[in-house]
Amino acid sequence: MKLSDIGEFGFIDRIKKDTIVNPASVVVGIGDDGAVYKTTEGKEQVAVIDTMIEGRHFIIGKTATWYEAGYKAVASNLSDIAAMGAEPTHLVLSVALTPQMDAAQTDELYRGMKDICRHYGVNILGGDTVVSSEGAVLTVAAFGEIEAGKAVLRSGAVPGDIVAVSHTLGNSGAGLDVLLAGEAGYAALKKAHAMPVPQVELGRLAVKYGCHSLNDISDGLASESNEIAAASHVDLILDKLQIPLSDELRRWCEVSGKDPYAYALTGGEDYELVLTMAPDDFYLLKEEFSALTAIGRVQAGSGKVYLKDGHHTQVLAPSGWNHFSGGE
C-alpha cells in the first residue's frame, strides 16, 4: 500500500499511536492546530532543529534503513539538547515523503523515531506532512529543559581548563566509508554511523559538576573545538595522541590505508561531547562517568586551536562538514 492510497489523514492516523510517552506534561498532542505542553517552574527551555535529506544524509539500502533514518533524525537533535546540558522533553517534526513510498516503509521510519523517543522519555507532540517530488526530507525540532541559568554554552571555557571528549571518535565517519564500500563486518562502525547515541546522561552530569563549556561533535573535533575556542576567546591545545580511537577504527584504517585521526578530527556525526572544565571537577565527573578522556588544555589566547603531535605543534583549522561548501 502506497501513501497515495491512504492519504494524509490516513497517514496521520497510522503514525500517531505511541507518540506520547510522558503524558503528565502534555495538554494537547497530535490532532489539533498546535500542541500544548506544560513547563516546569524554575526551568528554562532549550529548542533545537535539524534536517536530514534522503540522498544527502542517508541512502536507503546502502547507508541506512528507514528505521535507522528515523532514529538518527531524532538522535541528532537530542545530541544538541545534550550539548546544552538539558534534559530532552518533547519534539515536533515535519516530514516530506513521496506518494510512491510504501506505507510499511513509513511505519519503519516512525518506529525508529518512536523507539529512541521512548528510550529518552521524549513526547512526539505533532508536526507536518507534505509531499516531496524526490526523496524524503526529515526535519525535527526538539525541546528540553534545564535549571534556570545553568545552560552550558560554547563560550564558557577559561584558561586552566582540561579539554576532554566522551568515548571514542571517528567511528561514524569510518562507518559511512565502510557502508559505502559495501564491506562486510565492522558492525560497531556501521552502527556508530547509522544509530548514534546522544550523550544525554553526560550532558546532565556536566551541569552537575560545573562544566564550563560544552559542544557536541557533529561536524568533527576540529570544527567543534574551534567553535569553543572562538566563542570563549581562548586557545585550546590538543594532544593528538590522546584522542581516543576504537580498536575497530584502527583495524579499518590498517586495511583501507586511511588515517584514523583524520576520521576523529573531520569525520563528523560522532555525536559525542567535547567539554572543558576545571581539573578537580573533571576528575570528580570522571569517577561517575568513566568514558571520558582528557585530550588537552585551555590557555589564554585569541580563539585558535593547536594540535600537538609529539614535538610538533600546528594550528588546527576548523575543517569538517560544511553544508554549503559540501565538505571540508
Which residues does each PLM region occupy?
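A short, polar/proline- and glycine-enriched secondary-structure boundary/capping micro-motif
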Residues: R56-I60, G175-D177, L316-S319, G327
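Residue-level signal for pocket-adjacent positions within structured domains
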Residues: P23-S25, G31-D32, A47-V48, I53-G55, ...
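Gly/Ser/Thr-rich beta-alpha loop segments that engage phosphate groups in nucleotides
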Residues: G31-D33, E87, D128-T129, I146, ...
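Glycine-/charge-enriched secondary-structure boundary and capping motifs
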Residues: M1-G10, R14-I20, K43, A64, ...
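Catalytic-loop motifs flanking and including active-site residues across diverse enzymes
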Residues: A69-A73, L202, L221
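Short, well-ordered alpha-helical segments in soluble proteins
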Residues: C117, G144-E147, H167-G173, L180-E183, ...
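Short, acidic (Asp/Glu-rich) active-site segment that either coordinates a divalent metal cofactor
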Residues: I49-T51, R56, G135-V137, A151-R204
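Glycine-rich phosphate/pyrophosphate-binding loop regions near the starts of catalytic domains
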Residues: G10, K17, V21-V165
